[in-house]
A protein has these predicted regions:
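Basic/aromatic-rich interaction segments and small domains that mediate binding to polyanionic partners
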Residues: 3-65, 70
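Short intrinsically disordered terminal tails
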Residues: 75-77
Length: 77
């Protein structure tokens, strides 16, 4: 899949060091050719909680059948 900046993506793996779970939504903020992405994850109020460099295979595009949910985010000390 070819992503571009500002695409909304779904995390397809667990990232416990960042308290990110499979299914969390993020926004592509930079594309590293050929297979890297910088993805920003924010709270529902818009506060950035994680900015992570990922491989293209670590995310998937949002599809029409995806349902959005809310969960608490554990902040690192």
């Amino acid at each position: 899949m070819k992503y571009k900046e500002l695409d909304v993506v779904v995390l397809d793996k667990e990232l416990p060091d960042h308290d990110l779970r499979r299914g969390d939504l993020g926004t592509v903020v930079h594309v590293y050719e050929p297979n890297g992405l910088e993805v920003e994850f924010v709270t529902a109020s818009g506060r950035t909680e994680a900015l992570v460099t990922l491989a293209v295979g670590d995310v998937r595009p949002v599809v029409d059948t995806d349902l959005i949910s809310v969960r608490p985010f554990r902040r690192s000390a």
